[in-house]
């Protein structure tokens, strides 16, 4: 993927009317979404403080011998655990605050669930990158102050992306730029000393790593989360809005699935493979729900084939939500998924199952065999509506027999009312769902409609009706699927392209310092030929020519000629430049390639040479004692309140005890003042 994105030649970083890529939304704007993110930031800090207090109490309990002290510490530890549980419930309340993200013109529709953006702390790239440029590339790092400032501005802007395609492009631009930065400045054999801290969007617990892959994985997660917010913002009262919502949720599922497949050892619960699998299912379920709304938007005619289609579409939505609820109820996801999300999935599963039975009942009760009716087609549709017909009934006989149709239709109404009752009951059990007024209205209206329809057709002998309505077969005319991110469609210019072509001048390759070669062309003969393009190499060097005597070697890369940078020049351009000096003395600087360094794993967001085990290993649950390449035992994942307990102290302490980065840094010269410098909080979000 990266190879397709490499720039063919240096491009100007500043383009007219293209400055938005360094800008997010105004972080000081008091919008509903910004207030929600600010509350999330405050909660994250409180959770971090509580986790540190619990870790300290556990350490004290471990070393204390006095019984009174131990009893007091145990009491304090119980208070801290209680505080953590309350903070977790508050964070869950933010995650189910769906009203903030819905379209302002939403009317009578069930809200959709968006994902909140992960938060991060500031990172100062300046000192580390300048030192590496001087050490590895033998160039003055201060010549790249503007490029480093651009990178830091871009990262800061990604903390407040706008809720539209521009915001998505901003995040994807930074993700691709991180690929360039990783290739140029992050060798696989050592850590660079940059600490990246990101907060879990579901639990609020911070994770810190010196690995750039944590940064890339978190940016991808935020890209998927932003797509979900775009999807919930779409106007679901219009055909175009619903199509946009379907597309946004499919793209969100694609980004999250790509994250799951690419970064397999993620360091936080919200990016663990199990959690991401559930989130992908949730996005596809919401896309399928939008498909049903798109079909129902023009109105549902009381016509046989239309009702069959709508009933099966509703059954499809109910089926995917039932599968989603089952996935949310499995360990280890169950311990960390917001309870309100699982409850809403269960509510929707019953609600749409009820709609499937309701529409089936209407088509059976109101059906009339009129002259010219295509009974064969209707018989085929009715037979495909069920896996099997009730005992003693056949599709054709049921269509012709009014009594059988009404009895079967009322059986469907009874099942619809049962599902409605279950959806209302499930919604009433969850405090967060009870506070969503539009959800309560939709559920009650649907339940009342089914009840009134049944009352209109109720007869005295209905208790003798022994027909059990079968389940409706789920079917859809538009099967939703993930849409993978298309990074290759986005043109991104490497900020540090002045260092040279990335395929050659990267952190994986070691170079000699530039050597100055002074020589002259004798009778127009340079004494060597050239090969390659950007950069050009010395080839077929005459051992007796002046360039060879001056120290040139075959295979050297030409980086400059008479102070003209040649790293991006083609062979013909370099040859033309050399010949332009005639027989005058030429000063040429060359570098030689040293031995290549070994590569590291590229699919683990937590792999790092020489680092002790971190919080990410809790997610992996890998047994410490098994050091062989054989299959390792998987231990049970920990719940929110069991992080950092005594028996798991070795696994959790390294990440929860976060260092503070406060070293003095040289002033970075920026092109434009950043509005983010006005913020006092490390993790302020829009």
Curated annotation (Swiss-Prot):
Subcellular locations according to the entry: Cytoplasm, Perinuclear region
Domain of life: Eukaryota
Residues of the REM-1 domain: 26-100
Keywords, in A-Z order: Coiled coil, Cytoplasm, Phosphoprotein
Induction of expression: By thyrotropin (TSH). Regulated by the cAMP pathway.
PDZ domain boundaries: 515-593
GO cellular component terms given for this protein: cytosol; perinuclear region of cytoplasm; plasma membrane
SUPFAM superfamilies: HR1 repeat, PDZ domain-like
PROSITE patterns in the cross-refs: BRO1 (PS51180), REM_1 (PS51860)
Quaternary context: Interacts with GTP-bound RhoA and RhoB. Interacts with both GTP- and GDP-bound RhoA. According to PubMed:12473120, it does not interact with RhoA. Interacts with KRT18.
Protein name: Rhophilin-2
């Amino acid at each position: 993927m990266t190879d397709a994105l490499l720039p063919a030649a240096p491009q100007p970083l500043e383009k007219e009317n293209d400055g938005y890529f360094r800008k997010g939304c105004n972080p000081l704007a008091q919008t509903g979404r910004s207030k929600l993110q600010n509350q999330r930031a405050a909660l994250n800090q409180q959770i971090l403080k509580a986790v540190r207090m619990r870790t300290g109490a556990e350490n004290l309990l471990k070393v204390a011998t006095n019984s009174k002290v131990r009893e007091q510490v145990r009491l304090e530890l119980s208070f801290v655990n209680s505080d953590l549980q309350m903070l977790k419930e508050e964070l869950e309340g933010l995650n189910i605050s769906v009203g903030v993200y819905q379209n302002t013109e939403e009317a009578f529709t069930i809200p959709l669930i968006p994902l909140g953006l992960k938060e991060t702390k500031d990172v100062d790239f300046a000192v580390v990158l300048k030192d590496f440029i001087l050490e590895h590339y033998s160039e003055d790092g201060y010549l790249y102050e503007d490029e480093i400032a651009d990178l830091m501005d871009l990262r800061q802007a990604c903390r407040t992306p706008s809720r539209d395609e521009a915001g998505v492009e901003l995040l994807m631009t930074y993700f691709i730029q991180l690929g360039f930065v990783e290739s140029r400045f992050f060798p696989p054999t050592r850590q660079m000393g940059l600490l990246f801290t990101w907060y879990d969007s579901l639990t609020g617990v911070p994770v810190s790593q010196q690995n750039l892959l944590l940064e890339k994985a978190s940016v991808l997660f935020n890209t998927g989360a932003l797509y979900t917010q775009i999807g919930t913002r779409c106007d679901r009262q219009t055909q175009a809005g619903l199509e946009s919502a379907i597309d946004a949720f499919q793209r969100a599922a694609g980004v999250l699935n790509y994250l799951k497949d690419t970064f397999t050892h993620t360091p936080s619960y919200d990016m663990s493979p199990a959690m991401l699998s559930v989130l992908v299912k949730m996005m596809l379920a919401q896309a399928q729900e939008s498909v049903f709304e798109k079909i129902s938007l023009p109105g549902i005619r009381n016509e046989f084939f239309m009702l069959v289609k709508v009933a099966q579409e509703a059954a499809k939505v109910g089926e995917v939500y039932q599968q989603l609820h089952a996935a949310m109820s499995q360990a280890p996801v169950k311990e960390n998924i917001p309870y309100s999300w699982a409850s809403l999935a269960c509510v929707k599963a019953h609600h749409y199952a009820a709609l499937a039975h309701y529409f089936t009942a209407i088509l059976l009760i109101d059906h009339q065999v009129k002259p010219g009716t295509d009974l064969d087609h209707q018989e085929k549709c009715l037979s495909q509506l069920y896996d099997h017909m009730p005992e003693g009934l056949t599709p054709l006989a049921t269509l012709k027999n009014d009594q059988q149709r009404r009895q079967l239709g009322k059986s469907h109404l009874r099942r619809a009312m049962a599902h409605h009752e279950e959806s209302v009951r499930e919604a009433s059990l969850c405090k967060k769902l009870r506070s969503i007024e539009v959800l309560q209205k939709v559920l009650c209206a649907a339940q009342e409609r089914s009840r009134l329809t049944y009352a209109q057709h109720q007869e005295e002998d209905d208790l003798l009706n022994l027909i059990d309505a079968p389940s409706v077969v789920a079917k859809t005319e538009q099967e939703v699927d993930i849409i993978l991110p298309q990074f290759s469609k986005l043109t991104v210019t490497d900020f540090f392209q002045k260092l040279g072509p990335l395929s050659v001048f990267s952190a994986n390759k070691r170079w000699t310092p530039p050597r100055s070669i002074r020589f002259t062309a004798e009778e127009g003969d340079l004494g060597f030929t050239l090969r390659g393009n950007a950069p050009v190499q010395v080839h077929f060097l005459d051992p007796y020519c002046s360039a060879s005597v001056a120290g040139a070697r075959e295979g050297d890369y030409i980086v400059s000629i008479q102070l003209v940078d040649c790293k991006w020049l083609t062979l013909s351009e370099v040859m033309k430049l050399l010949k332009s000096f005639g027989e005058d003395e030429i000063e040429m600087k060359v570098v030689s390639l040293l031995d290549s360094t070994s590569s590291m794993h590229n699919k683990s967001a937590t792999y790092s040479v020489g680092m002790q085990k971190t919080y990410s290993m809790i997610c992996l649950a890998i047994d410490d004692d098994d050091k062989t390449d054989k299959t390792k035992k998987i231990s049970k994942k920990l719940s929110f309140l069991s992080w950092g307990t005594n028996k798991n102290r070795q696994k959790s302490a390294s990440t929860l005890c976060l260092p503070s980065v406060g070293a003095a840094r040289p002033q970075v010269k920026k092109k434009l003042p950043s509005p983010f410098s006005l913020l006092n909080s490390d993790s302020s979000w829009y």
